[in-house]
Amino acid sequence: MDDLFSLAPPLPSSVECDRWIEHLFSARAAINGHVVRRKARDVERIVGWPRFRFELRRRGFTAIRNGAQVVIFCNALPLHKV
């Protein structure tokens, strides 16, 4: 029986992580202070939650995970549950 983990793709390099973060926060919506969303699986797989949280704090942004999606509020405004 094959090793289950041998089928998994290799972990991305630090350069790929940096490029993914740069791509995310250079989206027009992010630049204009709006909302962007990404798959939670991609955040975890590509950059990891600690790095993702660090990048959010560094920019003063907030993110919410709902199911398989992460919604990123690209501004420092408070959130109000409706």
Model regions and ranges:
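Short, compact, well-ordered microdomains
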Residues: 50-82
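Short, contiguous, helix-prone interaction/anchoring segments in small proteins
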Residues: 27-61
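A sequence-composition feature that detects small, non-aromatic residues
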Residues: 8, 27-30, 40, 63, ...
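A signal for specific C-terminal beta-sheet/loop modules enriched in small/flexible residues
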Residues: 13-25, 49, 74-82
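An N-terminal amphipathic alpha-helical segment
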Residues: 1-35
